[in-house]
């Protein structure tokens, strides 16, 4: 065991933590660089690839069970869905998870024959916007930061989005007559409220009055749809209109665009694009 002092180095906890933080920073930097530097896709070649994935998605157990859960909740209002609003989908031509989520939204759009599908994400490239249009979607002209009113039965799809975005959807529809029009697929409210938060915000207030249906992540590609639930707000479960304390709106929350982009970069695995 000669020269043991040269062969081995004592690594203190502080040094280990510092290295771990640097590795996280480097990984984040590489993912960020990938999203920026990734070559743009050829729309004509990418369209059939997405179409094939939509077909596979609509045949998956995950999709069929999710559609059944959604249909059960729609029976409560006895109206069809008329609009989809998809916020924070991510750069679906460049990331694996976002690509499968895009296929889910397109499949849902077709399955329920919804007349209007609106999308917004600050990371969308022009090619991704064009693909959305080719699949009968529309790009919202500006960032509404979740401030969108459900004047008709509306499915909001917010996969792994910031807390503020989900809060602002509720804030915009904080009326006993409007909340039943909201069908929200997002991170589980039950899980989110396990972390202590402002007791006056809308997610904390509504959690005991909403119906949450977990969408079990049994999709063949793991972690694409983890921790997502369908949230609905049946009118019979809501407090009466005379409950002024409950129905008084608190302030909307600020959605930091950088936070939305950061969550996209750090939570989605890079999708290797192959030129065909």
Curated annotation (Swiss-Prot):
Keywords attached to this entry: Biological rhythms, Phosphoprotein
GO BP, one annotated term: circadian rhythm
Family annotation (InterPro entries): SRR1-like, SRR1L
Residues with the Phosphoserine modification: 30
Keyword Transmembrane helix in record: no
Modified residues (Phosphotyrosine): 34
Keyword Ligase: no
Listed GO CC annotations: cytoplasm; nucleus
Task performed by this protein: Possible regulator involved in a circadian clock input pathway.
Similarity field: Belongs to the SRR1 family.
Name this polypeptide is given: SRR1-like protein
Species, as recorded: Drosophila melanogaster (Fruit fly)
Source lineage: Eukaryota, Metazoa, Ecdysozoa, Arthropoda, Hexapoda
